[in-house]
Amino acid sequence: MGLLGGPKGGPEPAAAKSPAAGPLPGDWAGELFAAGVTCLCCEAWGEAYACFAETGRRDAPTLYNMALCCFGVAWYEECHRLVCEAERMLPPDGEPQPKGTLGSAEQGGSPGGELPEPFRRREAADGPPRCPMPGGLPRNRARTLMLRLRAEAAARLGRREEVRAIAALLGNRYGHIETWIKKFDR
């Protein structure tokens, strides 16, 4: 894809000019999604948001990434709305993890798909989530990212009880959420 052209050097599809036109054809939406993830990694919030919006997708990874863009520019109400919408799109709990994904037996994961302890310790000590969500992330990892972002947005909106409820769902193990709860209790 060229910087100004469509996929593989072809012309930009007409549908790309209007996010309301629905999902884009072929590889174009996938390339825009990948470009959005790259922009998120560089904290180029506006460019990332534009890429995700232009895909026309309304799936969980796209909505989460758009929410992360909103969080990056302190638009917490929209961040919260988008991450809640993304959560509703996750597949229901109880469905088996596909082979080859984190948490499946051949990957050495536990039945619940938990990360090994060194990763969990590091994740719990880190601040608010800042990493984009790729497509295909295992459901339990996607849910954790979404809950952590929703807790952070809710805290900044002063929604104390929601933050406490999310902390409990996550086992009260994330430092950035526990810090908010301590601030609320002062």
Tell what function each PLM region has.
Residues 22-54, 149:
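Alpha-helical segment of the N-proximal tetratricopeptide repeat
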Residues 60-65, 89-102, 172-185:
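Boundary/linker segments of alpha-helical solenoid repeat arrays
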Residues 27-30, 34, 65, 142-152, ...:
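"A position-specific structural signal for the A-helix of alpha-solenoid helical repeats
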Residues 20-22, 52, 91-140:
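Flexible helix-coil transition and linker loops at the boundaries of alpha-helical arrays
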